Design a protein with these regions (language model features):
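Sec-dependent N-terminal signal peptides
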Residues: 4-14
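Extracellular, repeat-based ectodomains that mediate carbohydrate processing or recognition
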Residues: 19-481
Length: 481
């Protein structure tokens, strides 16, 4: 008995020492305050960070102007010096709004001017360009208005391709299409590509919609697009919200299946994974026939998957999805292996909107997961509001409430998991910012890129909030030492 007790003490001490040793290998720096839901956005609307030389430029929603449950926040810009490990000047770039979709994105153009775009939710938004190269200045006097797209924009996401700059976006409301615009090196204005990538409801699938994520290929000549689909059901017909797998009304809080589309950015042609040429825009029938990677058979997600190129240069996906019931969720790594798509479980999660991230470095996959043992449900969920309005609580299994407005799109603790083959995964470490405790939740992990679109594999950002009455919020910058 004594020997067993000694062994337990030694094992516990060893585990604590190992975690302390890992803690020394990274540092986390906090920035910003007064944030809203999506203080830093999920992968549909990126980037909020840009590295150039020893500087990391950051934009976010912050500096709230009221204490409402859904506060008004402003687009804020700041910078971080990698040598001095200090933040620079911080100030707002525009007026306050309670719409979290107004979160800014940032990039540098070919003239090395900093660009910021914000305030877009089915609207044209506001585009700012720095007057000086690679400088955010000290006030709005250091910026000028830019010319952006002449079309309604939602979820804008910027990338630098081999053929010029790319903005991928949804063109209007939920049931409209997704498309992209290009700006070549010698051009002043953006050109929206005439034909959308997807328009799911154009062939009779009334109000069918999708959410998208994308990355560029390593050579930046192709676009890897992942999307998930759902019935947007604007008429709020309870029958259309019914999920047969779970025998529940779940509303459009959940999206289904996993689809893939490849775009040649030089020719603007589209292909499925196997190289079949496809006619754009993709409707739901074509998606189900030629683009589907995973028929989830009623298992739902909220956020579209994170995409990565695997060891063989093929697209692979980190996806969170429901399991045997609506209150159990799991992360999967989906990759093409032995002529089929394999779905390898990694770890459980607590919300369908948890925004994890994944990188490949030193011949290993590193997944940074948002985790939690208790599923978060809030009175602000779209499903909850609908069920309350319709008196349908008894029809659902998801009516336990445990969160506030900031928890509407998930949140939890951060864990790093590692795999050499993408099949077998092992826990590596927890990532906990200083001066936070168990009352804090974190979300929307985002690896930083430079102005050429190259991923910085030892630096990412995320945001967090205190679920106690203080309602603190903060952005965080993670750096491997």
């Amino acid at each position: 008995m004594i020997n067993k007790l000694i062994a337990i003490i030694i094992l516990t001490t060893s585990q604590l020492s190992a975690q302390l040793e890992l803690d020394k290998k990274f540092a986390i720096y906090s920035f910003g305050e007064g944030g809203n839901l999506k203080m830093l956005y999920d992968r549909r609307q990126r980037p909020q960070a840009l590295k150039e030389g020893n500087e990391i430029y950051l934009v976010y929603n912050g500096n709230k102007v009221n204490e409402d449950e859904k506060p008004k926040t402003m687009p804020i810009i700041t910078s971080f010096n990698l040598k001095t490990k200090t933040f620079g000047n911080s100030y707002n770039l525009g007026s306050a709004s309670s719409d979290h979709h107004y979160c800014p994105i940032i990039w540098a153009d070919k003239k090395m001017k900093i660009n910021v775009f914000y305030g877009a939710h089915n609207s044209q938004g506001i585009h700012l360009i720095s007057k000086n190269k690679l400088s955010i200045g000290k006030s709005m006097d250091d910026w000028e208005k830019g010319t952006f797209l002449e079309t309604p924009v939602s979820y804008p996401s910027f990338s630098t391709s081999a053929f010029g700059d790319i903005i991928y976006f949804r063109n209007g409301g939920h049931t409209t299409n997704w498309r992209y615009a290009q700006k070549k090196d010698n051009e002043k204005y953006w050109t929206t590509i005439d034909i959308p990538t997807t328009d799911l409801d154009i062939s009779g699938m009334f109000e069918w919609s999708s959410y998208h994520s994308y990355i560029l290929s390593d050579d930046k000549k192709f676009m890897h697009i992942a999307f998930i689909s759902y019935d947007d059901n604007k008429e709020n017909n309870p029958g259309r919200y019914f999920n047969e797998r779970y025998n529940s009304i779940v509303t459009n809080d959940y999206k289904y299946n996993l689809y893939y589309l490849k775009i040649d950015l030089q020719t603007q042609r589209a292909y499925n994974f196997f190289g079949k040429s496809l006619k754009l825009p993709i409707d739901l029938n074509t998606a189900n026939k030629d683009c589907i990677i995973w028929n989830t058979e009623g298992r739902g997600s909220g956020i579209p998957p994170q995409i990565i190129e695997d060891k063989n240069g093929n697209p692979a996906f980190l996806h969170v999805i429901t399991e045997e019931n609506i209150n159990k969720l799991q992360y999967y790594f989906v990759k093409f292996l032995n002529k089929k798509w394999t779905k390898s479980p990694i770890r459980s999660s607590n919300h369908q909107w948890n925004n994890a991230d994944i990188i490949f470095k030193k011949n290993k996959y590193h997944a940074y997961l948002i985790t939690g043992d208790k599923v978060i449900k809030t009175p602000f969920d779209d499903a909850q509001k609908f069920l309350n309005q319709k008196g349908l609580k008894n029809w659902t299994k998801i009516n336990e409430l445990s969160g506030g407005y900031m928890d509407k799109h998930g949140g939890g603790q951060i864990e790093e998991w590692v795999s050499e083959d993408g099949i077998n995964w092992n826990f590596y470490k927890k990532i906990v910012p200083e001066n936070t405790d168990s009352d804090w939740r974190f979300n929307n992990i985002q690896f930083i890129k430079d102005r050429f679109g190259n991923q910085i594999k030892d630096a990412f950002i995320f945001y967090g909030w205190n679920i106690s009455k203080e309602r603190q919020t903060s952005g965080f910058l993670y750096l491997d030492n």
